[in-house]
């Protein structure tokens, strides 16, 4: 009778014996159970999951419960950030946190979000980039610095642009663009190799279509002039 009150999404505590099904799934032969938490609203149907993309974006908790791919994506991001920090630390970089509220929008050509600082009675802006403060730190004496920064841009959005996103910036004294190209290549090759076990990855393009990308080094080096000539046909 008590089973009639159980629904998908309920949390229960159980006592019983562990066993493995014919398909190899570890299960529990329940002898006793108690309610821990009752779901107040029904979850998406078990087999089809959450199919409405708008609902998935606005109610991420439903997306996480319904789609293991979403959970895996969050876990992969966490692993990537951890390996990214390890890579920077291994190469002698110091991580900094620069101000999110700034008196002037700087570091990129983008429209900022504006808010008001009540204590000082002044308008401030959510940062559009951490660049200026990081460069000031280099002037102050740091040799190698980086930041994994949340930034905000009050502009349009598409599959590759959001108003709030994470930006990674680093600066190293006496490096030129060739040093940065080499460093960036080594970064992606090492981190992707650790996390994916392959240099071939699949990612969405600007249109949302999945495309295959080969990160096997060495990467092609092209100057802006070479790319302009190739794209314009001149």
Task: Show the residue positions of the predicted features.
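Class II aminoacyl-tRNA synthetase catalytic cores and aaRS-like
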Residues: 1-234
């Amino acid at each position: 009778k008590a089973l009639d009150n159980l629904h998908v999404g309920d949390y229960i505590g159980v006592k019983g014996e562990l066993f493995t099904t014919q398909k190899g799934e570890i299960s529990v032969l329940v002898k006793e159970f108690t309610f821990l938490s009752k779901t107040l609203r029904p979850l998406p149907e078990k087999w089809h999951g959450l199919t409405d993309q708008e609902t998935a974006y606005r109610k991420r908790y439903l997306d996480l419960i319904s789609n293991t791919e979403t959970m895996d994506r969050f876990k992969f991001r966490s692993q990537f950030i951890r390996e990214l920090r390890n890579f920077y630390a291994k190469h002698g970089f110091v991580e900094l946190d620069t101000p999110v509220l700034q008196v002037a929008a700087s570091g990129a050509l983008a429209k900022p979000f504006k808010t008001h600082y009540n204590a000082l009675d002044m308008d401030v802006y959510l940062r559009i980039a951490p660049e200026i403060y990081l460069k000031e730190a280099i002037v102050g004496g740091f040799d190698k610095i980086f930041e994994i920064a949340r930034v905000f841009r009050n502009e349009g959005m598409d599959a590759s642009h959001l108003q709030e996103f994470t930006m990674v910036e680093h600066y190293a004294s006496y490096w030129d663009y060739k040093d940065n190209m080499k460093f960036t290549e080594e970064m992606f090759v090492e981190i992707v190799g650790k996390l994916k076990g392959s240099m071939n990855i699949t990612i969405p393009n600007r249109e949302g279509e999945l495309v295959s990308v080969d990160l096997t080094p060495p990467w092609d080096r092209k100057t802006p002039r070479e790319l302009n000539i190739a794209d314009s046909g001149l």
